[in-house]
């Protein structure tokens, strides 16, 4: 008998509009669920250009992103995340590879105490204008158990733990 893995401690969500696309796993083996852009006619989207200048752009089911433009893409969802959990947002590999559209903050983190509309912070790192349409899959979400830990200041510099110097490639390429 098959076990429905999706019903164990489900992630609850609220749709701000009936036309918001339901987040879902693309396949039985998908580790993450897909989130969609919710940009119907008249939606205002917050953007920042390459100079960091803020603008609100009214869109009509499509949003054009020029090279270097960052945008807060609405999903039309509010998550109800259980205490002790968070949702992590990741770029979609195909969108990143083919269109150069990635999460501007590398990974989005939605804490359990955030109960406001979810936006996806995207940037066009490609050389061409890219267009997002209402309903497009824009990122992947993953519900993660939070591990709580304290922070403790120490009075002595930590000792070297391995034979390496520095970071950023310090262990070599091969």
Model-derived regions: residue spans:
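DUTPase catalytic domain/fold
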Residues: 1-174
């Amino acid at each position: 008998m098959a076990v429905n893995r999706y019903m164990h401690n489900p992630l609850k969500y609220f749709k701000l509009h009936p036309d918001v696309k339901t987040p879902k796993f693309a396949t039985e083996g998908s580790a993450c669920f897909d989130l969609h852009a919710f940009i119907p006619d008249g939606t205002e989207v917050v953007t920042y250009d390459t100079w960091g200048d803020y603008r609100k752009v009214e869109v009509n089911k499509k949003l054009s992103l020029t090279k270097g433009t960052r945008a807060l893409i609405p999903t039309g969802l509010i998550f109800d995340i259980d205490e002790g959990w968070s949702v992590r947002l990741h770029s979609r590999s195909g969108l990143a590879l083919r269109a150069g559209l990635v999460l501007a903050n590398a990974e989005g983190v939605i804490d359990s105490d955030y109960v406001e509309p979810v936006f996806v912070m995207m940037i066009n790192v490609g050389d061409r204008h890219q267009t997002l349409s209402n309903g497009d899959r824009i990122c992947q979400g993953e519900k993660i158990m939070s591990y709580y830990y304290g922070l403790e200041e120490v009075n002595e510099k930590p000792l070297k733990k391995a034979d390496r110097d520095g970071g950023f490639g310090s262990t070599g390429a091969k």
